[in-house]
Amino acid sequence: MRIVISHPKAANRELWCAEMTTLLPGATVFAWQPGDPPGQADYAIGWHPGAALFTAVSGIKAFFSSGAGVDHVLGEPGYPADLPLIRLEDAGMARQMAEYCIYEVIRIYHQRERYEQQQRQHVWRELEPPPRTGFGVGVMGLGVLGAAVAGALSGLGYPVRGYSRSPREIAGIACFSGDAELPRFLAGCRVLILMLPLTAATTALVGRDFLAQLPAGAHLVNVARGALIIEDDLLAALDSGRLAGATLDVFGQEPLPGGHRFWDHPRVRITPHVAAITLVAESARQVAAKISKLELGEPVSGLVDRSRGY
């Protein structure tokens, strides 16, 4: 069995090669990048592989995304239409994502930013927290990671509501689905956490009309994909005070350009796409287990429905 690793970062290619060689000692694992000679492989693992991989390396039976999300592959016109695409499921990312979102929700609920302002002004004043029962936290996207985040926040006593394309039932979470229930979902979100996959249906979803359905003074947290948001509309909502703040971990262009207004906006908090970093060792174990199942002719989870984009 031959496994090819394609990743834009050399360090990641080396890590994946080392892990997969250890986990599947009978396999030949090799790295490939544009410009390398043609070859053959049974399985491919990578990130932003580019059309050249599928032209140069023949025999690939399935492609495994080496990070969260598969839009980097679905947006590649050279990706073979009949090649199975398999996504990572958690692989150590759910805990990181939950911690990131919990931190932001706690900061917002307990008004930490206002206390920091008061410190700079030498003001000693206790602030009354809002009633927790009315402090709705919405998680938009209830896949493996979204469901984990919703459950973690619910466990801390926040009233959590979740939204998904298809109906879901999750204990302790008020679940909404479909276009008809979206307005009611948004209306109850004092904090809205975006965890949607990037698809044709979700690209530029979060614009002026969408944001206007959130309660006045709501906060937005985006840990999914930057292209979900129309940036000018978000800035307008922040400038007007319609939104109280936004925490952004992902952007339409990364790294974020130095002159972008997000950098210095007083109502924006920025992190450099670190809400859930791919843990190669855990991810490789998951991929290796799935390859072993495929070799035995057994079904695997995480197979992407390309018509839906996830």
Protein language model regions, located:
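N-terminal glycine-/charge-rich "phosphate-binding" loop or analogous flexible N-terminal tail
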Residues: 1-41
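Short acidic low-complexity segments
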Residues: 28-40, 51-54, 173-188
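Phosphate/diphosphate ligand-binding glycine-rich loop within oxidoreductases
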Residues: 42-116
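Glycine-rich, N-terminal phosphate-binding loop of Rossmann-like dinucleotide-binding domains
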Residues: 48, 67, 194-196, 223-224, ...
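C-terminal helix-to-coil terminal segments
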Residues: 84-97, 114-115, 169, 254-310
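Glycine-rich NAD(P)-binding loop of Rossmann-like domains
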Residues: 115-148
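NAD(P)-binding Rossmann-fold cofactor-contacting core
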Residues: 156-172
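Rossmann-like adenosine-cofactor binding region
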Residues: 167-261
